[in-house]
Design a protein with these regions (language model features):
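Active-site glycine-centered loops adjacent to acidic/histidine catalytic or metal-binding residues
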Residues: 1, 40-41, 128, 162-163
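Short acidic, glycine-rich surface-loop motifs adjacent to enzyme active sites
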Residues: 117-136
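Outer-membrane beta-barrel translocator/channel fold
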Residues: 137-142
Length: 391
């Protein structure tokens, strides 16, 4: 996204900064800098902005013919559903956010331009959402599959996309199959998009009713702001993932061979099968605190002013590069029976490992546990692929 609330003034601020840094679209040495901009849902799908026609015409970027007029005024170029630009001999293709009424014809466009794009030399495709079924996709996607189908014919295609805010500590951020797909991370905050489905401890949901069900406060995703620095070669990419909050690498560089192929180093299924889960040290201890009132610093709305059991989980060690702890699977056992299971993100999951040595938390309401209190907690540390170490 360029804007946050879909307002023209937000794009104006962005354009002013661009002009300040690159006056006349040129670097300090006079070299031309190309604008490789694509819009996201916060630019073109800002349905939360309400008002009459006069107000929306003045304020909202997506209203009627505003995209074309505003884009031309701010960036001195046409607002095209799909554009193609050349930078130092490499082709870049960008596609705008689909609105449902004027969607970019991605599949048709790639069929028409197939001959000029085919080959071993990489070209780059930019859109807001991850292509369906690729990097950071998890069990949800905001792409309907059209970009995946369009790019599948090009082993030299490299898609760079976002929308998910997925942290770049996630080792599945690079996906290779019929093409290459890369999670761009998020400048504002690296989080975990899958958290909406399986975690209590990440993003606060925008749904006020669902927010009341959160047992734990969200982990600070602003601390996880990140970006990529990519060195481009004809047969490979060197990808550096960078923490903006700490101004240091988020992990080891990724060296990606091109063209893509199934079964390569970034085949996510093979990465998972060969990865090793993190391990607790032999001296690690789980601290269990019985609270008459849930701790305010940790508890979410569902446990405010209620009794709970607070688990304080020590950080496990990384056994193999690329397999740092990402989350914890906690089971409540009574005798040999599992009563319930919860998954929480590791505190520090989205920051450089050098500053991630932190205690993680998990809360259970007392009403979730046996009345006698006779139960056992089993904690398994997992990496970003869901591979667990020993309990």
């Amino acid at each position: 996204d360029i804007a946050h609330s879909g307002k023209i003034e937000e794009l104006e601020r962005f354009a002013a900064i661009w002009t300040q840094v690159f006056p006349g679209d040129r670097r300090s040495d006079g070299g031309v800098v190309e604008k490789l901009f694509v819009t996201g849902n916060h630019d073109l799908a800002a349905s939360w902005v309400k008002g009459d026609d006069e107000y929306l015409s003045r304020v909202l970027f997506a209203h009627k013919d505003n995209p074309g007029k505003v884009w031309k005024r701010l960036f001195n170029e046409e607002f095209l559903p799909i554009w193609k630009k050349e930078v130092k001999g490499y082709t870049f293709v960008g596609s705008q956010w689909p609105t449902g009424t004027d969607d970019p014809p991605v599949e048709e466009w790639f069929r028409e331009h197939a001959e000029e794009l085919r080959g071993s030399k990489p070209f780059f495709y930019l859109q807001h959402a991850h292509p369906k079924g690729t990097c950071g996709d998890g069990k949800i996607s905001y792409d309907d599959g059209r970009s995946t189908r369009a790019l599948a014919a090009f082993g030299n295609a490299v898609a760079i996309t976002g929308h998910s805010h997925q942290t770049l500590t996630d080792e599945s951020s690079v996906w290779q199959g019929s093409f290459t797909s890369i999670n761009a991370g998020c400048l504002r905050g690296g989080g975990n998009d899958r958290s909406r489905k399986i975690y209590d401890s990440c993003w606060p949901t925008y749904n006020k009713k669902l927010r009341l069900l959160n047992r734990m406060n969200p982990i600070d995703t602003l601390e996880g702001g990140c970006c990529l620095l990519i060195d481009v070669f004809d047969a490979s990419l060197r990808i550096r993932r960078w923490s903006l909050a700490y101004d240091q690498p988020l992990g080891e560089d990724w060296c990606v061979s091109l063209p893509a192929r199934t079964g390569g180093a970034f085949d996510n299924a093979l990465q998972r099968s060969s990865s090793v889960g993190p391990e607790f040290s032999t001296s690690a201890k789980l601290e269990v605190v019985v609270c008459s009132v849930a701790p305010k610093a940790v508890a979410g709305p569902a446990l405010h002013n209620k009794p709970c059991v607070w688990l304080k989980i020590p950080r496990p060690r990384t056994v193999k590069s690329g397999s740092r702890v990402y989350d914890f699977e906690i089971s409540v056992m009574e005798g040999g029976k599992q009563l319930l299971q919860r998954t929480v993100l590791a505190n520090g999951f989205n920051v450089p490992e050098a500053v991630a040595d932190r205690v993680s938390n998990c809360l259970f309401g007392r009403d979730e546990l046996p009345p006698t209190g006779a139960c056992r907690f089993v904690v398994r540390p997992r990496n970003a692929f869901g591979v667990a170490g020993r309990e």
